[in-house]
Amino acid sequence: MMSSIAAPKLKEKVEKFLSGKKKMYINGSFVESASGKTFDTPNPATGERLATVYEGDAEDIDRAVKAAREAFD
C-alpha cells in the first residue's frame, strides 16, 4: 500500500523571492542572460511552476569563463 502526503506550503518570504525572474551570477553581479530568454522550473513535489530563471547560452558561458579567468590571473 502506498501513501502520499501533501507537499508543504512555501513560506511567504520564499514565494516572494521566487516570484521574480532569477538572474545568473556572473562576475560578482546578478545579470540577465544575453538573449533575455527564460524558462520555468517545476516544483518536484507538485509539478507546478516554482521559479522562472534566465536561460544562459554560449555568450553567457563565455562571459562567466572570462570573469573567472580574470579573477584567477
Curated annotation (Swiss-Prot):
Pfam family, one: Aldedh
Tagged with keyword Membrane: no
GO molecular function terms attached to this record: aldehyde dehydrogenase (NAD+) activity
Keyword Ribonucleoprotein included in the entry's annotation: no
Catalytic reaction(s) noted: an aldehyde + NAD(+) + H2O = a carboxylate + NADH + 2 H(+)
Record-listed E.C. numbers: 1.2.1.3
GO aspect biological process, one term: ethanol catabolic process
Pathway assigned to this chain's UniProt record: Alcohol metabolism; ethanol degradation; acetate from ethanol: step 2/2
Signal peptide start and end residues: none
InterPro entries: Ald_DH/histidinol_DH, Ald_DH_N, Aldehyde_DH_dom
Keywords from the named record: NAD, Oxidoreductase
PANTHER family: ALDEHYDE DEHYDROGENASE-RELATED
Family membership: Belongs to the aldehyde dehydrogenase family.
Protein name: Aldehyde dehydrogenase
